[in-house]
Amino acid sequence: MNNPCGPVPLLFITGFLGSGKTTLLNRILDEAAAQGKKIGVIINEWGRVNIDSSLIRAKDIEIEELNDGQVFCSCLSGNFLEALVLLAKRSLDVVIVETSGMANPFPLRNILCDLKRLTGGHYVYQGMIALIDPESFLDLVEDINAVEEQVIASQRIIINKIELADGETLARIRKKIRQLNPHAG
């Protein structure tokens, strides 16, 4: 599983349902395809049926689907590691994980340690991007722990669909994000 070109970047995209994860993923895939890059994608859905994989437009990608749970919990973390080990056997330039909207990334550090052990350092963690829907974020972050944990764990936070929110709401969202994660870009 040693990659002659160095470790393969591993990037996570997270955010609650409707925040724009699949749209962002499609944009990244379109850009990567234009550059001739080979991409591996793991799509995680909370339910039994994976809707997002049918929305992925790019053709030259390797897709693994993990349904009926979230990749960071014990119910799917073993399958998640297996999918990453499988993708490590392919010649890929980057692997992107689109998490379930309910994903709580708290156990990520342990998963990354297990992944390093299983793949011999094949991957290099490039961070997590959290997408925020301004219409629902302020309510969700108070009611659903996973939303708060996604913001805390992310290196980049994107407030998506800003045209749908007024200036006061955006200011409150930015303030909440800074409270939870002052180091995110």
Regions found by a protein language model. Name each.
Residues 148-185:
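Canonical P-loop GTPase G-domain recognition
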Residues 9, 76, 104-107, 143-153, ...:
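Helical mechanochemical/support elements of P-loop NTPase systems and associated helical scaffolds
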